[in-house]
Amino acid sequence: MRELSSLRRAHDAEMERIHGWPESSPWIRRAVAALPRDRFAPDRLWQWDGHAYVPVDRDIDPGQWAGLVYGSLYEAAVTQVIGGLATSSLSCESVVADMLDCLDVRPGHRVLELGTGTGRNAALLAHRAGPGRVVSIETDPGLAEHARQRLKKTGADVHVVVGDGAQGRPRAEPFEPFDRVISTYAVDTVPWAWVEQTRPGGRIVTPWGHLGLVSLTVAGDGNSARGHVQGLAQFMPARGSSGGPEGDFSRVRAGRKPQHEHHARLDLSPLHADWHLRFALRVLLPDVHIAGSTDDDGTSVWLNDSTSSWAAFYAQDDGGVLVCEGGPRRLAGEVRKAWDWWTAAGEPALYDWGMTVTPERQWMWVGEESVVAPVLTAGAEPVGE
């Protein structure tokens, strides 16, 4: 207990050092202190060892377990692994604080949360909104039950429901419309049900595209919602989502030799480290996953579309790049075309992007709603040839 208290204080101090506690929402820091992370962490956590997730049990190694709970402010603690994939986590404190600040919950607000997980975020919401004001939807019955137990132990009055978050509140449940809606998992498309179940002027906050955090305000007539990207946020996708992790590259390539191969002169470092470019590519090429790494030779980048096409840029010791592609699409060319569009548009930053959602469609725009971002997935020329 003494070790946990020390880790809590250190975690709080580090958040203060990086200015992670939002000045506009002082209640968040108080709520976090009242509802510490360890009270919602299961006794088994999971740690990536470079090849697979391995269990870390509290009763076997309490020190390592506590270290995962109160580790980096920028890394989540994995709480469930199914089929080798992480499917639930205790979100990192910095992102939790950012999302709650964006949501702007007020006392008395009716709040819908999609993705209960450990129940910790729902408890923080209830701390602010008040008893009985939060409904949380969880697709996994086991996670939902464990969350109910933890919420009960901490005295948080939250109504946890098993259901599909994409449908929002089950029709038999109370509290429609909601003042605030928040998703704790990433989506590629904001479900219209979320907009329907939010009052005019209400707010929806969700991770989008596995990279950005979007805050939307529902229009006065309830027929649309719009808003801007608020920052970076890397969350797990919705269960059953077609969007796979960057690690899908090995599965998609499946050991096959390249169908196309050539050398090029490119500075690949922005593809790996420039998150403004990375977000733009996520918008322009929504089904292309990008991963990269840097070593003594330079930066290498891997692309895949989660199904049948892949590309790789391998850094060479002479400063050049070996470009390899396989599958029906020329992904290297598609990325180059999208990169050129971003450059020609003035290299818009993450915060320049906005989103509009209607019953018929939704789209991303830059600066003004009329400047609609294209989707560039065909007709690209090979890179460097």
Predicted segments with their positions:
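Conserved nucleotide-cofactor-binding alpha/beta core module
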Residues: 88-205, 217
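Class I SAM-dependent transferase core
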Residues: 2-112, 121, 143, 317, ...
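C-terminal lobe and adjacent flexible extensions of AdoMet/dcAdoMet transferase-like proteins
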Residues: 218, 281-385
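Residue-level detector of flexible, active-site-proximal loop/helix-junction positions
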Residues: 47, 141, 165-167, 211, ...
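Class I SAM-binding transferase module
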Residues: 182-298, 378-383
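Short amphipathic alpha-helical segments enriched in hydrophobics
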Residues: 22, 36-40, 183, 339, ...
